[in-house]
């Protein structure tokens, strides 16, 4: 699925998800669209939206004791009854969720357990990660002594921007900022421990939060191949860009094309899309089984 068509006001067509206004609730449909470097590619990954939704739903249930979340229902028949809609289960089942509407906090909350990606590039240049000084001598893909919290300012369109925690503190209630940081690291630590049994290293991940009546809740997606780097533990070694089960495979391909990371992006070959789909399915299988 590339686009959804539902008889509700479309609040936002995101990079991957279509968000509809359902009064005090939101209806979210995860498409098979692919976003890399904040640009939506003209190609899709088959069943990606269903896989992301299934993984998110798994983690929302697993982490409810750490932080409440926005979930109401992911059952398409129940959603049809609640909203008095006639959504075709063949088209919308598995990729559609009904959630609580909230006040979104406009920061992406990134937790990094290992140095890689943009953090590695910055570290090579300046010895910092998101402006924070990091100890010298780290190799690519090396584990940090402790997970680090590196927020990013949230952009609906264009590039999200890495910022320091000090910047975050200066742009919102300080107590709330510290609670978000603490909760993000707790979520990361919980997932990292669980994923060890799955043969997956959680290199880094991002969370998004909102407020309902002043209470912090977890929203959007959680611990998916789109929002996380999942490395194959069997193939991990420092000094490399370890292979895994996530969107990094597509990012790496797109970097090799010579594309300047500005719109419009080039198409992704079908062979790359199918290989990415296989990686996403492997992540889902391992996560649901709780083992390799």
Swiss-Prot record:
Show the InterPro entries listed in the entry: SAICAR_synt/ADE2_N (IPR028923), SAICAR_synth (IPR001636), SAICAR_synthetase_CS (IPR018236)
State if Flavoprotein is listed as a keyword. no
An annotated GO cellular component: cytoplasm
Q: Which domain of life is it from?
A: Bacteria
Name the Gene Ontology biological process terms: 'de novo' IMP biosynthetic process
Q: What is its EC number?
A: 6.3.2.6
The record's keywords, sorted A to Z, are: ATP-binding, Ligase, Nucleotide-binding, Purine biosynthesis
Could you cite one Gene Ontology molecular function of this protein? ATP binding
Please name one Pfam family that this protein belongs to. SAICAR_synt
Pathway membership, UniProt: Purine metabolism; IMP biosynthesis via de novo pathway; 5-amino-1-(5-phospho-D-ribosyl)imidazole-4-carboxamide from 5-amino-1-(5-phospho-D-ribosyl)imidazole-4-carboxylate: step 1/2
Reaction catalysed by this enzyme: 5-amino-1-(5-phospho-D-ribosyl)imidazole-4-carboxylate + L-aspartate + ATP = (2S)-2-[5-amino-1-(5-phospho-beta-D-ribosyl)imidazole-4-carboxamido]succinate + ADP + phosphate + 2 H(+)
Q: What top-level class of enzyme does the UniProt entry assign?
A: ligase
Cross-referenced SUPFAM superfamilies, in alphabetical order? SAICAR synthase-like
Of which family is this protein a member? Belongs to the SAICAR synthetase family.
Please report the name of this protein according to its UniProt entry: Phosphoribosylaminoimidazole-succinocarboxamide synthase
Task: Please report the organism this UniProt entry assigns to the protein.
Answer: Elusimicrobium minutum (strain Pei191)
């Amino acid at each position: 699925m590339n686009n959804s068509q539902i008889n509700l006001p479309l609040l936002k067509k995101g990079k991957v998800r279509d968000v509809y206004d359902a009064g005090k609730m939101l209806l979210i449909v995860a498409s098979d669209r692919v976003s890399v470097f904040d640009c939506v590619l003209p190609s899709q990954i088959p069943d990606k939206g269903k896989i992301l939704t299934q993984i998110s739903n798994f983690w929302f249930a697993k982490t409810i004791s750490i932080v409440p979340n926005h979930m109401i229902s992911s059952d398409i028949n129940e959603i049809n009854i609640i909203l008095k809609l006639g959504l075709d289960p063949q088209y919308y089942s598995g990729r559609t969720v009904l959630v609580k509407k909230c006040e979104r906090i406009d920061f992406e909350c990134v937790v990094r357990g290992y140095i890689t990606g943009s953090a590695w590039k910055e570290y090579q240049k300046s010895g910092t990660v998101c402006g924070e000084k990091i100890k010298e001598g780290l190799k690519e893909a090396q584990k940090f002594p402790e997970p680090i919290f590196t927020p990013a300012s949230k952009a609906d369109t264009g590039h999200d921007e890495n910022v320091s925690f000090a910047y975050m503190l200066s742009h919102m209630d300080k107590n709330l900022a510290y609670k978000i940081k603490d909760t993000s690291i707790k979520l990361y630590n919980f997932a990292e421990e669980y994923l060890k049994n799955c043969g997956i290293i959680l290199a880094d991940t991002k969370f998004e939060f909102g407020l309902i009546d002043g209470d912090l809740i977890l929203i959007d997606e959680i611990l998916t191949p789109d929002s996380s780097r999942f490395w194959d533990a069997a193939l991990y070694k420092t000094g490399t860009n370890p292979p895994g089960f996530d969107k990094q495979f597509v990012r790496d391909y797109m970097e090799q094309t010579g594309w300047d990371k500005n719109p419009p992006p080039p198409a992704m070959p079908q062979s790359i899309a199918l290989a990415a789909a296989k990686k996403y399915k492997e992540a889902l299988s391992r996560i649901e089984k709780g083992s390799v």
